[in-house]
Every structure is written in structure tokens, then in C-alpha cells.
């Protein structure tokens, strides 16, 4: 990337900063990502890659045991059009997933999200063709400024403090661009906990930072895509050197929860690969995306050279998805996709919530699973769409429902409390499960859960 023109050494050397304990190794490389997308697209085009913008994929095709292609929808004009695609291999790279749980900042505004509001495309596509999913039962929550959701908390260089000025954690007492304040990484629910206990709010304090340090922080935020936040603060006269910035815990998202893949990015379905935050067994973030995108891309290309095209457009899965989405367009006065999405968020937030303040149980999860089935039944028969845009959103809601189904079933199968998965009927952490992954997947119409050793290769 550095050779291509992504500035990986903006200070002249490789610099790792943030998300680290004082005095311990820093693993996160800080670089200038402002031109990253432009550079990577340029390099991809240079080797012959073709881009089809405004063509979301809404279904995968499987012929025999292999992936054979996909169904895209051309949404470049007001009237959508189906575009079947034959493919020898497929690599999913749709990013993380928002809009599955009620928005913690602004419940009525679903798109106030800490990242790009991606919506479960990769996980939903993989789920429906039988790919195994892993770590779906563990809620991932991020944090950042209150009400205006923006992630990138490690780019803030200050100290988390109580209202009386006392540091919340023991790791930082002054602003530090090298380490930041790692308290919220260690104590994931800190911002929610201090509010629940009445000892909050929690503030990010940069009052002791130098002008040079603040200039660095603002530059780093620009490289991380936080320009809307910076613009808002400047417009409203919010100066972190003078004003404490309240932080909060955001709603659960699927970030490093999803498809179970091999070291080369291949899922349990031959010919189907995945890279990035929709992968469930490799961590998350840019490092995983870069590694699996590179390795998975090479592996997918090598495998494609050994197989023939198959008639993906003739498969039942493609036919059924075309019929379902067409029925939405035939029902322009039908229920709005937002109604279905918000109902899904309510079900997930009430029956499969994130701990530690809220709990799960067999009775809650079974009820949630039943309500989810009822919601899907109603949505498929009542949802309508008036144009390409609303059809795309309706398809996203169906993908989100698939993720909800995977989460409910995985949470039922993990009969213990671990991390933010808190079972009131199994309040302990089972040490015998510490070296195992729980995977779930569709086999026919049934959801099947299985345990596998963490270091065991992905099985088909």
C-alpha cells in the first residue's frame, strides 16, 4: 500500500499508537487513510478489475456443493432490474453490520451509526446458502461521542474522567497520543455502567493537551474518516481543550462476527470466500480485511482456474429471491421497510440484548425466535417498495433478519455466560469451552449448532 501511494508512514517511520496498555507493545499502525479508497480502486483497475456500482447482491447461487454465482439488482435508475451473474468463485466483503439493534443514541434515527451503515449483506448471503457462522452470540459494542455516533475512540488522546475530574480508569492521567486511555477497551461497558450507577457521565478530557498534540489528533481523525464530527465541533464551537466531550456505549453491531473461514478466507461452502468485518473467526478491522482480501483473492482466483461456469441463473434460490423482491415492487402501497426494520430492532434489543446490564435466557430467546419468525412471515407478505432505493432497503432488512436468526440460535446453544453474552439461567463461564468455537448454519430448513476446536480448520 505504501508503494501504491497510501501514506503508511506519515511521520517518516512506521508508527503504532492507541488501544494499548501503558508501557506495553502498541500493535495498531497509524497511517493516513484519507486517499485509501481512491488508491486501491486505481490499483484494482490497473490489473483489469471491473466495478459495478449500484449493483447490490441480494442472493447467491449454489449448484451441487459449490457456489455458482449471484443475483444482483441494478439500482442505478429508479426502476430496478435483476442482473444474474455466473461466477466460478465468490468473495464476500460487505463490511460490518448496523441497524440490527435499536439505536442507542437516537432510537428514531437508524442511520446515526458509528461506521458506514452497512447491513448484513455478506452474513445474510452466506447464511442462506448454508455457510457456517461463528461468534454470532457475542454482542460487539463500540463507543464514542454521545448522540452523534462516530467510532475511532483510540484516536482521542485524552483521559476518561468522572464529572469531578477523577480518572475513571487507572491507565491514564494525562493526554497521550502514543497510548491514549485504554480504559474503555478493558472495561467495555464503562460508559453504560457509570450512567446506570449514577456516577456518570463519563467525559473525554483533552484539556491538558498541547496545541501540537491537538493538531495531531485532528489530523488523525481526518485520516479515520471523522470529518463530519470535526466539522460539527468547529461549527458549534466545541473545543476539546476547553470542553469535556461526553462518551457513550453504542448499540450492538456485527463486527468480527459472521462467516467461519479458513486461513485463505474460504467458508464451509466450496467456492465461497469472505474477507473483512463480516468474518467471525479472525478478529476485525482493516488488518483482517487487508490480509484476507489479499490471501482470499489469490485463493479464489486460483480455484476459479480449475472449475467451469455453471447456470447460476437457473437455480431455485435465484428464482425465489427474484419472485420475492418482485412481489415488493408489485405492492407499492405495502408496509414500509422501516417498519419491518424497527420491529426487528425491538425484538433483538428485548430478547437478545447485550450484557452485562441486560440478560438472555432460554425463555427470552425462544420468545424472540418465535417473534422473529412471525415478523419475517409478515414482512415477506406485506412489505412494499416503490423504487430501486426502497427495494434495496427491503432486501437489507431480510438480510438482517437472517442475522437475527443466527444470533438467537447461537445464543441458545451457548449455555454459559461469557463476555457480553450473559445467560441468567447459566450465570457461570464454563472453562471447558474456552478453546472452542460455536458455529451455526442452515442444513435444509433447520438451524444446526456445532462446537469445534478454535485451531481446527474450517470443515465442510
Which role fits each region the language model picked out?
Residues 92-149, 286-299:
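Glycine-rich loop(s) and the adjacent beta-strand/alpha-helix scaffold that form part
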Residues 229-268, 315:
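FAD/FMN-dependent oxidoreductases across multiple families
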Residues 30-34, 38, 116, 120, ...:
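Electropositive phosphate-/nucleotide-binding environments in soluble metabolic enzymes
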Residues 125, 131-243, 299, 303-306:
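An anion/pyrophosphate-binding glycine-rich loop and adjacent beta-alpha core
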Amino acid at each position: 500500500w505504501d508503494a501504491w501511494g497510501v501514506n503508511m508512514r506519515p511521520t517518516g517511520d512506521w508508527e503504532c499508537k492507541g488501544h494499548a496498555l501503558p508501557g506495553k507493545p502498541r500493535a495498531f499502525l497509524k497511517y493516513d487513510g484519507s486517499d485509501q479508497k481512491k488508491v486501491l480502486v486505481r490499483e484494482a483497475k490497473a490489473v483489469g478489475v471491473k466495478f459495478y456500482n449500484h449493483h447490490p447482491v441480494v442472493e447467491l447461487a449454489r449448484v451441487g456443493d459449490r457456489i455458482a454465482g449471484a443475483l444482483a439488482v441494478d439500482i442505478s435508475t429508479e426502476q430496478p432490474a435483476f442482473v444474474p451473474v455466473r461466477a466460478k468463485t465468490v468473495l464476500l466483503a460487505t463490511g460490518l453490520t448496523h441497524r440490527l439493534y435499536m439505536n442507542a443514541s437516537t432510537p428514531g434515527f437508524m442511520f446515526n451509526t458509528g461506521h458506514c451503515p452497512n447491513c448484513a449483506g455478506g452474513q445474510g448471503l452466506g447464511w442462506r446458502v448454508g455457510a457456517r457462522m461463528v461468534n454470532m452470540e457475542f454482542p460487539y459494542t463500540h463507543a464514542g461521542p454521545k448522540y452523534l455516533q462516530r467510532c475511532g475512540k483510540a484516536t482521542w488522546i485524552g483521559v476518561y474522567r468522572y464529572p469531578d475530574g477523577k480518572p475513571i480508569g487507572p491507565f491514564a492521567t494525562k493526554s497521550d497520543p502514543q497510548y491514549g486511555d485504554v480504559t474503555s477497551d478493558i472495561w467495555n461497558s464503562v460508559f453504560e455502567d457509570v450512567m446506570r450507577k449514577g456516577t456518570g457521565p463519563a467525559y473525554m478530557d483533552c484539556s491538558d493537551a498541547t496545541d501540537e498534540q491537538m493538531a495531531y489528533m485532528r489530523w488523525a481523525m481526518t485520516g479515520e474518516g471523522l470529518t463530519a464530527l470535526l466539522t460539527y465541533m468547529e461549527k458549534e464551537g466545541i473545543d476539546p481543550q476547553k470542553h469535556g466531550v461526553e462518551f457513550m456505549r453504542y448499540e450492538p453491531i456485527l463486527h468480527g462476527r459472521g462467516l467461519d473461514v479458513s486461513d485463505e478466507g474460504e467458508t464451509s461452502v466450496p467456492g465461497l470466500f469472505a474477507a473483512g468485518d463480516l468474518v467471525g473467526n479472525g478478529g476485525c478491522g482493516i488488518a483482517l480485511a487487508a490480509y484476507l482480501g489479499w490471501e482470499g483473492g489469490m485463493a479464489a482466483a486460483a480455484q476459479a482456474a480449475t472449475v467451469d461456469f455453471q447456470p447460476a441463473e437457473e437455480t431455485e434460490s435465484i428464482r425465489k429471491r427474484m419472485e420475492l423482491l418482485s412481489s415488493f415492487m408489485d405492492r407499492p402501497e405495502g408496509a414500509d421497510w422501516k417498519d419491518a426494520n424497527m420491529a426487528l430492532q425491538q425484538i433483538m434489543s428485548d430478547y437478545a440484548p447485550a450484557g452485562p446490564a441486560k440478560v438472555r435466557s432460554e425463555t427470552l430467546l425462544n420468545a424472540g425466535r418465535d417473534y422473529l419468525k412471525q415478523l419475517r412471515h409478515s414482512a415477506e407478505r406485506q412489505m412494499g417498495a416503490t423504487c430501486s432505493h426502497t427495494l434495496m432497503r427491503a432486501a437489507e432488512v431480510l438480510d438482517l433478519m437472517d442475522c437475527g436468526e443466527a444470533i438467537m440460535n447461537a445464543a441458545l446453544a451457548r449455555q454459559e455466560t461469557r463476555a457480553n453474552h450473559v445467560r441468567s439461567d447459566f450465570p457461570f463461564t464454563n472453562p471447558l469451552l474456552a478453546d472452542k468455537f460455536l458455529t451455526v448454519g442452515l442444513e435444509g430448513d433447520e438451524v444446526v449448532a456445532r462446537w469445534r476446536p478454535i485451531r481446527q480448520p474450517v470443515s465442510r
